[in-house]
Design a protein with these regions (language model features):
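Phosphate-coordination loops involved in phosphoryl transfer and adenosine-cofactor binding
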Residues: 46-51, 156-158, 265
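Glycine-rich phosphate/diphosphate-binding loop of Rossmann-like nucleotide-binding domains
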Residues: 56-69, 152-230
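Short, structured coil segments at secondary-structure junctions
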Residues: 73, 103, 123-125, 180, ...
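Rossmann-like adenosine-cofactor binding region
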Residues: 203-283
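Adenosine-phosphate binding glycine-rich loop
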Residues: 265-266, 271-314
Length: 314
């Protein structure tokens, strides 16, 4: 079995609740390991290890990529759907987390409140992984920056422009970009900006190595950027706001006109699912500069790297 980079040794047995749980060296080492796993030049053996999936929100890419990542490492997953477990009937997180710690080796949790995720981590004696909350989507951000690194061969000094709602994806892009020395420009209409506290955390993490900023005009957001990124305007749980958000985001569609304002080598990213004709045009998502499906594949590779690090012998 391959040996982990010494930079990742501190992650053994740890939780991954936020992008800011990593430092710069760990984030870079995870991306390198993910690239090696993707190329087949590294192999890890997690035979006999079990990852529990607790997903309170719908999922395609996150659920499948974690399941396949664990299988490729020799382990297995168990799907703990809230509707068919006592979680859905109100069993306290404290009880569920302690019991599952006796059965599983790690938990990947997709839920609404970051506080619930933190409760699982508090009570569990095994690693807990953020598979998406309303506040962050850190595994997605790792895949995003791996995709950017594949396109340009490096990360530091590049600019990623995100246009859309200042949501969980935007938060994790700011935090992870700050760690990796990537300038992250969030473009969003007034009233839809990211949480100021997350912006402050990202600026502190950047330490002058990257500029993390928010603008309220789409062309200003994307001008000269090396990656243009967007996401749905109404996230899960916000469906009742769809019509209002469509009005607010009129003019913010990532289309050919907006793409023309970016660096000529710019790549296009979207975490999916995409609503063609709303936040992104069909021509752009299917165009030559799109790396959307490479990005989706990279979820599996970064999560393999993460699982190998968290479940390494302590």
């Amino acid at each position: 079995m391959a040996c982990l980079d010494v930079a990742l040794a501190g992650l053994a047995g740890a939780d991954f609740l936020s992008s800011s749980d990593l430092d710069q060296v760990q984030a870079e080492a995870l991306l390198t390991l993910a690239a090696q796993l993707k190329a087949g030049s590294q192999r890890f053996d997690l035979t006999g290890r079990v990852l529990g999936l607790i997903f309170s929100k719908a999922s395609t890419r996150t659920r499948v990529s974690f399941t396949v990542a664990m299988a490729r490492l020799g382990g297995q997953t168990i799907d703990l759907l809230p509707l068919v477990t006592q979680v859905g009937r109100g069993e306290p997180i404290a009880d569920t987390a302690r019991v599952l710690s006796r059965y599983c080796d790690a938990l990947a949790i997709r839920t609404f409140a970051q506080a619930d995720l933190a409760d699982y981590a508090h009570w569990a004696s095994i690693p807990v992984i953020n598979a998406l909350t309303d506040e962050e989507h850190p595994c997605q951000a790792l895949a995003d920056f791996l995709t950017l690194r594949e396109a340009f061969g490096h990360l530091e000094g590049l600019t990623l422009a995100y246009v859309g709602d200042g949501n969980n994806v935007a938060h994790s892009l700011m935090l992870t970009g700050a760690l990796l020395g990537v300038n992250v420009r969030i473009g969003t209409p007034e009233g839809f900006a990211p949480d100021p506290a997350v912006l402050e955390r990202a600026a502190a993490l950047a330490g002058g190595r990257a500029e993390i900023s928010v603008v309220h005009e789409p062309v200003a957001a994307v001008r000269g950027a090396h990656a243009l990124y967007t996401d749905v305007w109404a996230s899960m749980g916000q469906e009742q706001e769809q019509a209002e958000r469509e009005r607010a985001f009129r003019g913010w569609c990532l289309d050919g006109e907006l793409l023309a304002e970016a660096d000529s080598r710019a790549i296009v990213l979207h975490c999916l699912p995409a609503h063609r004709g709303e936040e992104i045009s069909a021509a752009v998502i299917e165009g030559a500069q799109s790396r959307v499906f490479d990005q989706a594949e990279n979820r599996m590779h970064v999560q393999q790297a993460l699982l190998a690090a968290l479940l390494a012998p302590g």
